[in-house]
Amino acid sequence: MPKTIITPPGTGKPLAPFVPGTLADGVVYVSGTLAFDKNNNVVHVGDAAAQTRHVLETIKSVIETAGGCMDDVTFNSIFLTDWQNYAAINQVYAEYFPGDKPARYCIQCGLVKPDALIEIATVAHIGR
């Protein structure tokens, strides 16, 4: 199955051997996304809502670069470092998915950088 690598303009180099997203058979797979700037520094330190917005804007950029939109998202994997941030994360999340919500799960865990509060990986079906 052929795949297309999706790298939006202005994307920094990943910390590990992966790409921001891939497109295969009309499905966009967005890698785990954190609130990083182009130099892989965490932005909005201590602010879960702002980090969530940054993460979702980055995911939106990957999906739009592939030719889709946020309405095409069918599944999200959410990783957060502290359940105390759950309400703030959900408030921002709901802004990006105002209609039919995608399936998802949410796990509390440690992340690759100590100041990162949230990571989201996404699957979107475009061209439906």
Curated annotation (Swiss-Prot):
GO molecular function term, any single one: deaminase activity
Entry GO CC: cytosol
Q: What is its EC number?
A: 3.5.-.-
What Gene3D superfamilies does the annotation carry? RutC-like
Q: Which InterPro entries match?
A: RutC, RutC-like_sf, YjgF/YER057c/UK114
Q: Which GO terms describe its biological process?
A: nitrogen utilization; uracil catabolic process
Q: Name the chemical reaction catalysed here.
A: (Z)-3-aminoacrylate + H2O + H(+) = 3-oxopropanoate + NH4(+)
Q: What class does this enzyme belong to in the EC scheme?
A: hydrolase
Its keywords, alphabetically, are: Hydrolase
Signal peptide residues are none
Q: Which cysteines are joined by disulfide bonds?
A: none
Q: Name the family the entry cites.
A: Belongs to the RutC family.
NCBIfam families (UniProt xref): RutC
Function per UniProt: Involved in pyrimidine catabolism. Catalyzes the deamination of 3-aminoacrylate to malonic semialdehyde, a reaction that can also occur spontaneously. RutC may facilitate the reaction and modulate the metabolic fitness, rather than catalyzing essential functions.
Q: What is this protein called?
A: 3-aminoacrylate deaminase RutC
Q: Write the lineage as a comma-separated list.
A: Bacteria, Pseudomonadati, Pseudomonadota, Gammaproteobacteria, Enterobacterales
